[in-house]
Amino acid sequence: SYSNLNNAQSTAATSQIDNATTVAGVTAAQNTANELNTAMGQLQNGINDQNTVKQQVNFTDADQGKKDAYTNAVTNAQGILDKANGQNMTKAQVEAALNQVTTAKNALNGDANVRQAKSDAKANLGTLTHLNNAQKQDLTSQIEGATTVNGVNSVKTK
């Protein structure tokens, strides 16, 4: 019934339930196991979208440190979730790992970096006096249509 627990957690939970000497003790051990099982499920849900996240511009054009923080948080979560090799982590430790994943995902700034690159490119365009208005308008459209920092920068250099 504790399908989200790794083997170490499951063994520990079963042991706590088996070793309880009162009904209240059994109930407390079961409640602890249930809460941990829920937290582990939430941790799994927190990384289920990792492949999608890693393909999005918000990740691919993010600062390297922010990409690393997300990747490391996911790797840490996967280690906890590993059925065979995961450690007997507490609910608080599991929740901290989920918080690490969520915080790192929310800190990804690839989309903001693309917006900044567009802003910089358009500002640079304004300084190019050798271009006529039609050329500037065409380049502005290309800048706006770009979806990555490299895409924006390739327009600037034309």
State where each predicted segment sits.
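Amphipathic alpha-helical assembly segments used for oligomerization, scaffolding, or translocation
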Residues: 1-158
